[in-house]
């Protein structure tokens, strides 16, 4: 990624952030410090301090596994990120929450829809329950008092990261949000409500978070739920355990007698959840180094459990995959004032955090979610709490139609109905939308029975954002072969998720075939970014080369057309998939386009 694409927006969308310029935008990337083992950590800190002394700004992105390495206990290897990376910047601009929102909005405007699809967990409910049972055994044996057990949700993210962040920020406004463009082309979208530690002029402040309840938006109901959460014996016990752990951790670098707990069991609403926090404060020893501070505090006890070391060993045993930046740390370090060893800094605990891989049209994503487990935890209840915490992401609606166009007549009924139902059902499942196969079939059959007895018709079956199905019909006018095709002026990105599904997000395609139609042609053919033929705006395409019909593979970026599949499976056609370049198209012996309404048609 070029330096301009590396940035960090640390975004305070809380009410306090609305009133004061507490968000920070870091630009003019000056370099990245990394380490892949504990041996390199002190060098990273030393280089970071040197950069800060030069007046640069530092944004650390630290993995949970860094803590295990610092404690010299087992940790699963990271394959797609360093153990720690510190982004260095020349510029830091302070912003209000509204200014931060405007900065994101200007980069999200005019982009294609952004969202997530194909959400899947690396731990199912049975495995989750089994892990909780094993944790209870460890607690009974005296190994631990509380374990923060977590798992991962994997998904596909599509659209602009700015547009996706904008949508999620509206659902989960928090004081420790972050949108970070990473040097490898990946991105972090964090919506964390939890402070790990903040240093301000010698004072350390930690605000561990334990205790969750649903928030519904009704002020009176939420007030009752907040009061119940604040008084809940189990949640108070969990919270207090972590407060004691944080008091002990802070005490290792604090001036004697300065560790205090000014606030216990505060409840705050963040989006669809209520969270209980407590505040721990201490005065930092003047001689404490950054290395000592991290050794004492990292990782945050709220996302391990107590006691920290043994509990982290249990976590490594029970969790199947590394956590990465989830439950590690994200934050900022300011340059020191004259005479100071280091300046102010602030680190959040990156919960509710999306890690996105590199990519343009489609990125692989991961979200960690977990719960604090004590002996009397109810496994099913804890699993439900995890699902609640993830709802800000998993409940993000994909607000576009998914549809099929089907050739039908009163006499013959709908053509290839099973194939159409299978395709729309697969698309609905991918985009997280309910789909009733039997209801869809009945709607189409009823629509056919209502058609005039003469003529051929186009049925359009659509699933709306609310998952409701609707079917409409229109007469299908005849066409005469061969049809004419033209070449589209623009190219497509083969990673664009909307090329693989029939949705209403097809403005470029509709404009292309309509422009072609205005010139007397049937369709416009597209090429992708690699110069490979893909499809038409409303048809798949086959070319005849050396006596063989060839159609581009789906990996080129195209719709898995119903008629395309029929032709590939039909022995009479002897058609195969293959890459088709511009030169091959120009030399082709024949061209054939097809769709579900028209079937195969020779083209020129």
Descriptions of predicted regions:
Residues 239, 276, 381-458, 462-604:
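Helix-start/capping segments and mature chain N-termini
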Residues 1-406, 528:
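Extended alpha-helical targeting/anchoring segments
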